[in-house]
């Protein structure tokens, strides 16, 4: 099997056993990039020579007999809003194009410490908001890959990278994962540091992972989950044996609750039929849940927090380069400047209250099942799709994952979103793995 087809765990194991060299792995992905990048446009920065040099260094380290990190020799793609000291960080805007930083992001530092090779930077929408970059969907180049982690999802879907790092402030991991037919995992808020990452909102920004297996989600999470003094949201979380723990069988089959959310009316008819079929397959393991009326307010609360924070955090771009930023971003910043402080305070105060109400479900169920998107990836590249099926879970800081289980009428991927209890990510991933195995049979 060609190296680019292997999972991250398989690649690491083969390199450590000397069945593959890191250079072999790098060359396999380089060939793939050279074949498909001209159509997918997943990369904001990729330097073949530098990638091969890093792979050679990884091989030299291994052959010297020195201890190997858990991700030794693994290529990882990074969304172009994470600072890297040896590559430019452009944030998806010409304002920052080609600029470099000496203050590397904590996620990148942890990946390197674990032995990973940062292979390049993936395309993001403009300043991680809605105005799209150049990336296309690998399943259909005429369709959007979603956003804002467009390039990260597309690179994994096109087998140009085994895993990739992205971020989500509303639906920027789950949505592109669904559209591109890969696994996209957003851990609980506070597990992964945002230090050295373009900030939109302290309360909403969350780091995510793209890959092809649940095991790889556990493997990468174990490397980058860490308390960080530079990010006050982070906490200590046990990650020992996380990559194997997520694969363990439940002592009994997990129970799921199906949540339509108030946006169910916006789900296209084909997707509704697909989810009806899914519920029938899981009939012994799933029950329906009546959305509480408080769910409706979450969409307003999330928008108030996100846009108010963007008005503050992106003020440099707005004040110095207003004519160089997109219309959607400019309008969001201007709305953020207009909200009243009491409305912002109400939106913030309700995060904990609404989560407490929601968490009662987990006394009876292992996880929530809900759509990831309103349907297949939309035609055209100007619109990255609606994040509305992700909004509630991002606002509440709950772990969520998009699983490539369903298919739309145009044979495009359709993700199933699974949502778990806050800070119970291992059990949540175990439930997601059970679901993936059962429905992929």
Features from the language model and the residues they span:
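Short glycine/serine-rich loop/turn segments
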Residues: 71-207, 261, 372-384
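Acyltransferase
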Residues: 22-27, 269-290, 315-320, 344, ...
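An N-terminal boundary/leader segment
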Residues: 1-53, 343, 441
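Short, well-ordered beta-strand elements within core beta-sheets of diverse protein domains
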Residues: 11-17, 96-99, 205-212, 334-339, ...
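Short helix-loop capping/hinge segments that flank enzyme active sites or metal/cofactor-binding pockets
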Residues: 71-91, 250-255, 259, 301-355, ...
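Small-aliphatic-rich amphipathic alpha-helix that forms the alpha element of a beta-alpha
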Residues: 357-360, 383-404
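Structural helix-boundary/capping segments
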Residues: 35, 113, 158-163, 169-262, ...
């Amino acid at each position: 099997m060609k190296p680019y087809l292997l999972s991250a765990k398989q690649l690491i194991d083969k390199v450590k056993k000397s069945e593959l060299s890191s250079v072999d792995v790098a060359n396999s992905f380089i060939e793939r990039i050279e074949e498909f990048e001209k159509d997918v446009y997943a990369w904001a920065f990729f330097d073949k020579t530098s990638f091969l040099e890093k792979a050679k260094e990884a091989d030299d380290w291994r052959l010297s007999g020195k201890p190997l990190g858990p991700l030794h020799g693994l290529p990882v793609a990074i969304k172009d809003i994470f600072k890297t000291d040896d590559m430019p960080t452009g944030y998806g805007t010409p304002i920052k194009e080609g600029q470099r930083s000496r203050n590397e992001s904590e996620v990148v530092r942890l990946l390197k410490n674990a032995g990973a090779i940062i292979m390049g930077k993936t395309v993001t929408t403009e300043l991680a908001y809605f105005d799209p970059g150049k990336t296309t969907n690998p399943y259909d180049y005429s369709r959007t890959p979603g956003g804002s982690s467009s390039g990260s999802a597309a690179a994994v879907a096109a087998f140009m990278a085994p895993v990739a790092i992205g971020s989500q402030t509303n639906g920027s991991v789950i949505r592109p994962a669904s559209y591109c037919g890969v696994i996209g995992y957003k851990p609980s808020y506070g597990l992964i540091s945002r230090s050295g990452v373009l900030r939109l909102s302290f309360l909403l920004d969350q780091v995510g992972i793209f890959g092809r297996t649940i095991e790889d989600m556990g493997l990468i999470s174990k490397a980058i989950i860490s308390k960080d003094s530079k990010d006050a949201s982070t906490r200590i979380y046990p990650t020992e044996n996380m990559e194997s723990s997520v694969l363990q069988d439940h002592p009994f089959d997990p129970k799921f609750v199906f949540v339509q959310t108030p946006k169910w009316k916006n789900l296209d008819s084909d997707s509704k039929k697909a989810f009806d079929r899914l519920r029938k397959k899981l009939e012994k393991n799933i029950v329906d849940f009546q959305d509480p009326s408080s769910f409706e307010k979450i969409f307003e609360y999330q928008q108030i927090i996100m846009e108010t924070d963007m008005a503050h955090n992106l003020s440099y771009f707005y004040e110095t380069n207003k004519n160089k930023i997109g219309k959607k971003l400019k309008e969001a910043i201007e709305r953020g400047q207009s909200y009243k402080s009491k409305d912002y305070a109400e939106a913030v105060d309700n995060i904990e209250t609404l989560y407490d109400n929601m968490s009662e479900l987990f006394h009876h169920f292992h996880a929530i099942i809900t759509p990831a998107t309103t349907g297949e990836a939309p035609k055209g590249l100007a619109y990255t799709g609606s994040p509305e099926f992700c909004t509630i879970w991002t606002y509440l800081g709950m772990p969520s994952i998009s699983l490539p289980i369903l298919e739309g009428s145009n044979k495009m991927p359709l993700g199933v979103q699974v949502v778990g209890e806050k800070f119970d990510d291992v059990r949540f991933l175990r439930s997601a793995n059970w679901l993936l195995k059962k429905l992929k049979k």
